């Protein structure tokens, strides 16, 4: 993340450990699961099934059947899940492979007991794409009498994410945590590298820009200049090539 020999970057790496790929919460018979797209998912309940139940059915939303177990065999219905699901009749678990955002829904497992009564459990599944690697744009950088005015923007396409900016060893204050970092750096709070971490519930990615004191761009990763000099440089180079 930083050039070799910068010990402070080791501390920063510890702050940027990856997030878990699965987030689960339970409220009564409603289970919330958040998973990353492309992963394999197991929908199951935390309690044992009723003894000697007669029938077990998994639904996608409230009326579309995915699979039904009855008379010691499983019937898989025509749906977008066919070929991607497998039922374990012993536990009631439903295995789904390669989930996508289109699989977001409330899944219902309904069990018909031998008494004739029904019992059901609901699992609300949210599938999120992993966040892309952000690009840091240097909006402005200016040396101001031993201080450094810095304005950076952290850009990713069309995503609802959380932003966290880090200096060498610690995050910036909460009030600075958004897609744009605008701050004046003084000698006592100067950092060599500035990292933007974008994250959602299932993934995180980082982009980093590094400076040389007092206010000069050094090595960077995922950084982009908003530079007007390109407009001048490109025609100049073309002119030289044609002469």
From Swiss-Prot:
InterPro entries: CD2/SLAM_rcpt, Ig-like_dom, Ig-like_dom_sf, Ig-like_fold, Ig_sub, Ig_V-set. Keywords: Cell membrane, Disulfide bond, Glycoprotein, GPI-anchor, Immunoglobulin domain, Lipoprotein, Membrane, Repeat, Secreted, Signal. GO terms for biological process: defense response; immune response; natural killer cell activation. Glycans are attached at residues 40, 44, 104, 162, 189. Residues 1-26 form the signal peptide. CDD domains: IgV_CD2_like_N (cd05775). Its main location: membrane. Coiled coil: none annotated. It is a lipid-anchor; GPI-anchor. Gene3D superfamilies: Immunoglobulins. A lipid is attached at residue 220 (GPI-anchor amidated serine). GO terms for molecular function: receptor ligand activity. Disulfide bonds join 154-196. Residues 29-127, 132-212 form the Ig-like C2-type domain. Induction: By IFN-alpha/beta and IFN-gamma both at the level of CD48 mRNA and cell surface expression. GO terms for cellular component: extracellular exosome; membrane; membrane raft; plasma membrane; side of membrane. Glycosylphosphatidylinositol (GPI)-anchored cell surface glycoprotein that interacts via its N-terminal immunoglobulin domain with cell surface receptors including CD244/2B4 or CD2 to regulate immune cell function and activation. Participates in T-cell signaling transduction by associating with CD2 and efficiently bringing the Src family protein kinase LCK and LAT to the TCR/CD3 complex. In turn, promotes LCK phosphorylation and subsequent activation. This is CD48 antigen. The gene is CD48.
């Amino acid at each position: 993340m930083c050039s070799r020999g910068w010990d402070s970057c080791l501390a920063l790496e510890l702050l940027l450990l990856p997030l878990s790929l699965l987030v689960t919460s339970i409220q009564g018979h409603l289970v919330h699961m958040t998973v990353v797209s492309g992963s394999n998912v197991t929908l199951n309940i935390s309690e044992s099934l009723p003894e000697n139940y007669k029938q077990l059915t998994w639904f996608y939303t409230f009326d579309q059947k995915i699979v039904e177990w009855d008379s010691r065999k499983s019937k898989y219905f025509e749906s977008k899940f066919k070929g991607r699901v497998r039922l374990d009749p012993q536990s009631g678990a439903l295995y789904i492979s390669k989930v996508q955002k289109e699989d977001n829904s409330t899944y219902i497992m309904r069990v018909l007991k031998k008494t004739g009564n029904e019992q059901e459990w609901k699992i609300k599944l949210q599938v999120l794409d992993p966040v892309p690697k952000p690009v840091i744009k240097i909006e402005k950088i200016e040396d101001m009498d031993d201080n450094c005015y810095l304005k950076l923007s952290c850009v990713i396409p069309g995503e609802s994410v959380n932003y966290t900016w880090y200096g060498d060893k610690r995050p910036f204050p909460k009030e600075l945590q958004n897609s744009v970092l605008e701050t004046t750096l003084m000698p006592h709070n100067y950092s060599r590298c500035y990292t933007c971490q974008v994250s959602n519930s299932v993934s995180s990615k980082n982009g980093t820009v590094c400076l040389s004191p007092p206010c000069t761009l050094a090595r960077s990763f995922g950084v982009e200049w908003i530079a007007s000099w390109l407009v001048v440089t490109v025609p100049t180079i073309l002119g030289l090539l044609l002469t």
